[in-house]
Amino acid sequence: LDRTQRIEHPLQVGKLNRAVSSHLEPGGKGINVSRAIKALGGSSIALGFSAGTNGRIMKDMLTAADIHHDFVDIAGQLRVNTQIIDAQGGHTEVNEPGNKLDDSDFLRLLDRMENYLDEGNIFVLSGSTPPEFPLKNYRKLCKTIKKHGCKLIIDAQGELLQEALRCEPDFVKPNIFELAEAVGDKPSAD
């Protein structure tokens, strides 16, 4: 979940900052992909993990927005990423850690994916993975998608991007910093 809070003054670290507004919405790169597809008149199914009360809130919000989803419920609580915006437009972000997965959680995700692995379907793997998520599992996701004749789009960075490139995705969407990191260069201001 993404929480945006607005304050009327510059953020004062170590002091009470009262928000004048607060907004909660489903968040994460994958959810944003589904929202964009919906806004363009298409349909998608958001897959991934959900946890606890926050997970139920997210699923209810997605259902209300007519965004289809099929999440694997896991132990713990879905993380909330908080953004504080001050009157001058300054942004401060605080991102909670995600939940660790056990092997059975990952296997349940693979089983859930089986329902959607029809040739020609498009899968977007975007964002970060849960803490301590093995690269071999990310590779397995990529290979499973490609093996079934589905299109694979990657929006990742670092080791995840490197691992995904080995699976020959159909499209990769790195930003300038992710691309520079992938090729061992520094982004230029040009």
Please provide the spans of the model-predicted regions.
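Short, small-residue-enriched loops and turns at beta-alpha junctions
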Residues: 99-102, 129-133, 160-162, 181
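Conserved phosphate/ATP/ADP-binding segment of small-molecule kinases
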Residues: 136-190
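Short beta-strands and strand-loop turn motifs
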Residues: 93-95, 120-128, 155, 173-176
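Positively charged, low-complexity intrinsically disordered leader regions
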Residues: 1-13
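Short acidic/histidine-rich motifs immediately flanking catalytic phosphotransfer sites
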Residues: 117-122, 168
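Substrate-binding N-lobe of the ribokinase-like
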Residues: 18-78
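Conserved phosphate-binding/catalytic loop of the ribokinase/pfkB sugar-kinase fold
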Residues: 84-119
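Cofactor-binding loop segments of dinucleotide-utilizing enzymes, especially the Rossmann-like FAD-
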Residues: 1, 49-52, 74, 87, ...
